[in-house]
From Swiss-Prot:
Name the UniProt record assigns to this protein: Oligoribonuclease, mitochondrial
Family membership: Belongs to the oligoribonuclease family.
Record: residues binding Mg(2+) 1: 47, 49, 199
Keyword Mitochondrion carried by entry: yes
UniProt domain Exonuclease: residue ranges: 43-207
Transit peptide: 1-25
Physiological role: 3'-to-5'exoribonuclease that preferentially degrades DNA and RNA oligonucleotides composed of only two nucleotides. Binds and degrades longer oligonucleotides with a lower affinity. Plays dual roles in mitochondria, scavenging nanoRNAs (small RNA oligonucleotides of <5 nucleotides) that are produced by the degradosome and clearing short RNAs that are generated by RNA processing. Essential for correct initiation of mitochondrial transcription, degrading mitochondrial RNA dinucleotides to prevent RNA-primed transcription at non-canonical sites in the mitochondrial genome.
A single GO cellular-component term on record: nucleolus
InterPro entries associated with the record: Exonuclease_RNaseT/DNA_pol3 (IPR013520), Oligoribonuclease (IPR022894), RNaseH-like_sf (IPR012337), RNaseH_sf (IPR036397)
Pfam families for this protein: RNase_T
Record's subunit section: Homodimer. Homotetramer.
Keyword Nucleus: yes
Modified residues (N6-acetyllysine): 173
Organism: Bos taurus
Amino acid sequence: MLGGSLGSRLLRGVGGTRGQFRARGVREGGAAMAAGESMAQRMVWVDLEMTGLDIEKDQIIEMACLITDSDLNILAEGPNLIIKQPDELLDSMSDWCKEHHGKSGLTKAVKESTMTLQQAEYEFLSFVRQQTPPGLCPLAGNSVHADKKFLDKYMPQFMKHLHYRIIDVSTVKELCRRWYPEEYEFAPKKAASHRALDDISESIKELQFYRNNIFKKKTDEKKRKIIENGENEKTVS
């Protein structure tokens, strides 16, 4: 066992006293905790292109994923995957899907792809596991409830990694249209490319607009009035 003075000298020789080591450990532990909390606030943005909206017969043909922090800054871009589907399914798509997926080049890309649904889920799951902790980060997107139905059915392992709640930009859009019609007129309009990665990027920009123009930071004056109103209500009650 080292003597007290010798032990202290050795500790100082490798970088500090016992107290300094404890302080450094606290700082590093706090930084790790903050990083973990930050990762838990991330959003998993997903957009799918399908052969239609019938969950019983239609299939996913394209998918893309972006990860943002809670302030909507893009942190990572995931795989943008084209999934092989049989020609019979593509030929049975609605006229709308045939027109738009044909114009965008997606139909041709699907026919040329060799990616299976199982491979796509594996790549997506590998990506989100690197970027987010399990069970904490929500699925986000525009009308993302429709995407979620297909993900629940065809990519259950991917969905198990996410939180059960969703962040649907279309909900904010509809509330803004009703409550703040003047601001709504300036909301970014979708380019309607009907390609997965483009649609996600547009959804993030749209939510950024609502955040900056609808979810406004309270000024000190507003905070004061809210506090006063709260105190008045307590007095009356």
